[in-house]
């Protein structure tokens, strides 16, 4: 009888351990996105990425609580804090939230708008299971597919263009130029070249190739649904819309 009870207890303990191991493996397994997934709009990210709407929820940096990470319904009801990180450059997709920490201090709040932030992080949609993808000074971040593209700081290169996979296992330098990844569309990142002629450039995330989309003196380029929008520095800072289907015709660009 005692032997049977002992065997039963051992069996139950074994089953419990198996369940715990299974749950641990399942909770640590990364949920991946499709190749064209994005985490936020260029307009939001170019303005600090302080909020992001996803699946009828708004994830935001609460200005009344030191820019800590909050979520609320899309009708602005039921706001609640997700964690105590002061955040910016918020991206949300699939099972995760991605953001840059601000290490908030009253005297450094302006760093959000100067792009001087500290570390790229991933957490679950409930704000838990925090994972550092990069833990030093960084700039704007954006999700494309299963990689976070971001401006990376180092002692040798003040800001460079990097990507890190959402599991945080592989970090790759793409360029020594600090391109902004804010505008992601169909697996391509578009940006105004911060050096040289300020052309609109495109970076193919599948081939890792950068090319000139349009020869112009641009700033804050944004590409959406067949059109590129940018500020033309040579036309008194006019807002210009470019039909990307007519790039090589005289009717391509219109001032707005």
Predicted feature descriptions by range:
Residues 248-255:
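Conserved small/polar residues in nucleotide/adenosyl-binding loops
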Residues 1-15:
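N-terminal Sec-pathway targeting helices
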Residues 38-67, 88:
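Beta-strand-rich domains and repeat architectures in extracellular enzymes and scaffolds
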Residues 73-75, 124-128, 165-169, 204-208, ...:
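Short loop/turn segments that connect beta-strands within beta-propeller blades
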Residues 59-60, 99-100, 149-151, 190-191, ...:
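Residue position within the beta-strands of beta-propeller blades
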Residues 36-42, 78-83, 129-134, 170-175, ...:
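A short beta-strand motif characteristic of beta-propeller blades
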Residues 63-66, 107-117, 154-159, 194-197, ...:
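Short, solvent-exposed loop/turn segments at conserved positions within beta-propeller repeat blades
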Residues 46-51, 86-94, 136-144, 178-185, ...:
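Repeated scaffold domains used in trafficking and secretory/extracellular systems
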């Amino acid at each position: 009888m005692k032997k049977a009870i002992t065997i039963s207890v051992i069996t139950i303990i074994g089953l419990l351990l198996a369940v715990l191991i299974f749950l641990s493996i399942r909770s640590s397994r990364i949920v991946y996105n499709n190749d064209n997934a994005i985490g936020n709009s260029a307009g939001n990210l170019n303005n600090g990425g302080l909020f992001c709407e996803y699946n009828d929820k708004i994830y935001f940096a609460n200005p009344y609580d030191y820019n800590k990470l909050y979520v609320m319904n899309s009708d602005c009801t039921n706001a609640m804090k997700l964690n105590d990180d002061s955040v910016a450059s918020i991206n949300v997709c699939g099972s995760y939230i991605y953001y840059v920490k601000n290490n908030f201090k009253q005297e450094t709040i302006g760093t959000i708008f100067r792009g001087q932030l500290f570390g790229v992080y991933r957490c679950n949609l409930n704000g838990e299971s925090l994972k550092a993808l990069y833990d030093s000074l960084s700039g704007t971040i954006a999700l494309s597919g299963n990689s976070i593209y971001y401006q990376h700081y180092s002692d040798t290169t003040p800001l460079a263009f990097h990507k890190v996979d959402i599991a945080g296992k592989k970090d790759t330098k793409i360029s020594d130029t600090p391109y902004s990844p804010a505008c992601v569309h169909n697996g391509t990142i578009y940006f105004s070249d911060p050096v040289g002629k300020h052309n609109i450039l495109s970076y193919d995330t599948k081939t890792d190739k950068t090319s000139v989309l349009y020869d112009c003196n641009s700033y804050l380029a944004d590409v959406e649904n067949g059109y590129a929008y940018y500020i033309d520095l040579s036309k008194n800072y006019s807002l210009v819309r470019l039909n990307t289907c007519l790039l090589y015709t005289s009717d391509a660009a219109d001032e707005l």
